[in-house]
A protein has these predicted regions:
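N-terminal module-boundary/linker segments of secreted carbohydrate-active enzymes
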Residues: 7-55, 313-320
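Structural recognition of the beta-strand scaffold that forms the well-ordered cores
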Residues: 39-45, 74-80, 119-124, 154-159, ...
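Aromatic-lined carbohydrate-binding/catalytic grooves of carbohydrate-active enzymes
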Residues: 57, 61-168
Length: 489
């Protein structure tokens, strides 16, 4: 960890014994859009078709799903995974479909899919590029969310390839300035007006107004609080952070204004000048306001939480904006977090999305499917209505899985309250696969209105799962993992 101009004693203390974290990622309520209470049911292109998708394939798949009764069974989403998009954005910087494989554009495709009774879903990554190195959405959250909403997209999978984590370092702040939006002159508050917490310290610098700045706000270990920031009236104000330049590395800070967090990123800086300023627009109330400045990013998990929340709330704002602009009903977007379970999204996913991957990618290989089950089944307490553990898409009908293994795979996903996202070629599937994925009893268990994930009540060669259902009922599943017939008593 770099010192970042932290007071020498504080830096040594932090290295040797650590310091108490005084600024955590803000606690917020569950992410709610009203999109659906029960797990998603649909189809996705990735497991079978990978990067070989086009407009005709998607329309043929939707037609086959309707003809074979999958829409009636509940599979209402048709989702395009990676490689739907062009490698170049349009002249406005917006995402666009592949110019050759989706020549009609995405909005007309959405309209055709909707006309069949389905909803269309798309994919991007919480990074600079997608997993297949196409344009992604990190840093363009509001713009891309607006594009999705205007197209009428109703599901969005957000991967984690090419992610650039938020910096754990904070800038060196010597003052904040608050200016009523549209006005030239604002009120400056020198850092000496702030109350410091944790490792935050005043450091001397004769070249600055006020002769000092605050360091030690890094990695959640420090905080500075301005308790009496005055606003003449309630409204939008420009908050300017005046900083001392230091270090050739990015920095990050949250400005929490009356409990509402605003994020500010600071790029790697050249040192031609001693100081710099960075701004955001905040909401102030008439009279005195409180502004807290801190960097809560102490880990990759902290960074991921903030980045996924940013896209989640951009989607929520975009669908509302489009509905108001068109004077039409809102089409909320079901938001799928896909960071592969490495940063324990089951602990925070319900504040940032509707479903979250708990494992790396699935494969149509039986031992791998059992490993995914073994990890996901333990997380039963983290699933609730509108918020689900996602052990990845179904491989039923793919690879060389036997009928019994396909049935076991589907039944386990139903009991674990998992999203049921088909990954096979539904145009060509055999009748026995169709029989499995339209099993009404299992689908009813998955879609039960109580929305409880099954608990493994017995572990062994035969696992026993119990899933609470509405009306005081319980569904029980016996999963024979041994590979040989077992007598159950």
């Amino acid at each position: 960890m770099k010192r970042n101009n932290m007071c020498p004693f504080c830096y040594i203390r932090n290295l040797l014994v650590g310091a108490k974290k005084v600024a955590a990622v803000p606690e917020i309520e569950k992410y709610e859009t009203g999109v659906r209470r029960t797990p998603l049911m649909g189809w996705s292109s990735w497991n079978t078709f990978r990067n070989h998708i086009d407009e005709d394939l998607i329309l043929e798949t939707a037609e086959a799903m309707k003809e074979k009764g999958l829409l009636d069974a509940g599979y209402s989403y048709v989702n395009l995974d990676d490689c739907w998009q062009s490698n170049v954005r349009d002249e406005n910087g917006d995402l666009q479909g592949d110019l050759a494989t989706f020549p009609s554009g995405i909005k007309p495709l959405v309209e055709k899919i909707n006309a069949m009774g389905f909803k269309l879903g798309l994919y991007s990554s919480n990074g600079t590029l997608t997993c297949e190195d196409l344009p992604a959405s990190l840093g363009r959250e509001r713009q891309d969310a607006q594009t999705l909403a205007e197209w009428g997209v109703e599901y969005f999978k957000y991967d984690f390839c090419h992610n650039v984590p938020l910096s754990s370092y904070a800038p060196l702040i010597w003052a904040v300035t608050v200016t009523e939006k549209g006005e030239k002159q604002g009120q400056r508050y020198l850092c000496s007006n702030a109350v410091l917490e944790g490792l935050a310290r005043f450091m001397p610098d004769k070249g600055l107004e006020g002769k000092r700045y605050v360091s030690g706000l890094d990695a959640g270990k420090g905080k500075m609080v301005f308790k009496n920031v005055f606003a003449r009236k309630s409204g939008d104000y420009v908050l300017t952070l005046n900083i001392k330049k230091h270090g050739r590395y990015p920095k990050f800070v949250i400005a929490e204004v009356n409990g509402t967090p605003y994020e500010i990123n600071f790029p790697d800086q050249k040192h031609f000048q001693h100081t710099a300023r960075f701004q955001t627009v905040v909401r102030l109330e008439e009279g005195n306001n409180e502004i807290k400045l801190y960097n809560p990013v102490a880990s990759g998990k902290d960074s991921a939480i903030l980045q996924y929340r940013k896209m989640a709330y951009a989607l929520k704002a975009a669908t509302k904006n489009v509905a108001e602009k068109r004077n039409a009903p809102e089409k909320p977007i079901l938001f799928s977090i896909c960071e592969w379970g490495f940063r324990k999204p089951w602990l925070w996913g319900d504040t940032a999305g509707n479903m979250w991957r708990t494992t790396p990618d699935i494969r149509p290989i039986w031992p791998w499917i059992k490993l995914i089950y073994a990890r996901n089944v333990k997380l039963f307490e983290r699933s609730s209505a509108g918020h689900f553990n996602d052990p990845d898409m179904l491989e039923v009908g793919n690879g060389k899985l036997s009928y019994d293994r396909n049935m076991s795979h589907f039944a386990l996903w139903c009991f674990m309250n998992a999203p049921l996202v088909l990954g096979n070629d539904v145009r060509k599937m055999p009748d026995n696969v169709l029989e499995i994925i339209t099993n009404k009893s299992l689908i009813n268990i998955n879609q039960d209105e109580l929305c409880k994930q099954a608990k493994r009540v017995k572990k062994g060669r035969v696992d026993v799962l119990a899933k609470p259902l509405a009306g005081g009922r319980t569904a029980v599943l016996f999963f024979n993992k041994s590979g040989v017939k077992k007598k159950i008593s």
